[in-house]
């Protein structure tokens, strides 16, 4: 069944899930929330709506497009049919870069990483550490490659999809990392779950609780197992620790400025 695009989530459970269900489910939910919230009007053309939900370039690996971005392009499809050499060239170049990331970096690196992981008892600290770093490279180039292929293919056809990665490994902290990594998913959770729960508007404790809820759901989205839920919760704790650290640092700086000002005032007097 995997050859025709379906996967079973457990060998003991005869449940079939189509490829990309986690992406187009969120895309459809986002559309529903936007219509309910008055951000857009409901699309009356079933074919245009179906194209929005199942837009094939980004169906398998994203990005998770918003109705406010992709749907207007579909509604005005006649305007993008005009041939544009620059657009097509840029789209093909983006696709080529995506294929390079996937085939020449991610797939090659995975051979080394899998060899070390599958035989971890044979390797020492240095090799295992290097494999961990290479695994991070593999994940980024694999996911980022798929996204760039999708964006490039869409661009060739005249559609502009959102950028899903912004050099995430150059992030200065975990919060900055999630602003750069899988941007479409992070922004989706922020707009449709975190903010409706109260965001950071209802006190510090509520903010941290909302963070735990969002990252717990995010972990479950990545994989239907407790491993992924724990992974999500760990990222939530890192976010909370980072926020507490920033708050403490801000208080220290503020108190230091007060002391400095008081000292200068005494000298003047």
Predicted regions and their residues:
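Membrane-embedded transmembrane alpha-helical bundles that form the catalytic cores
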Residues: 1-269
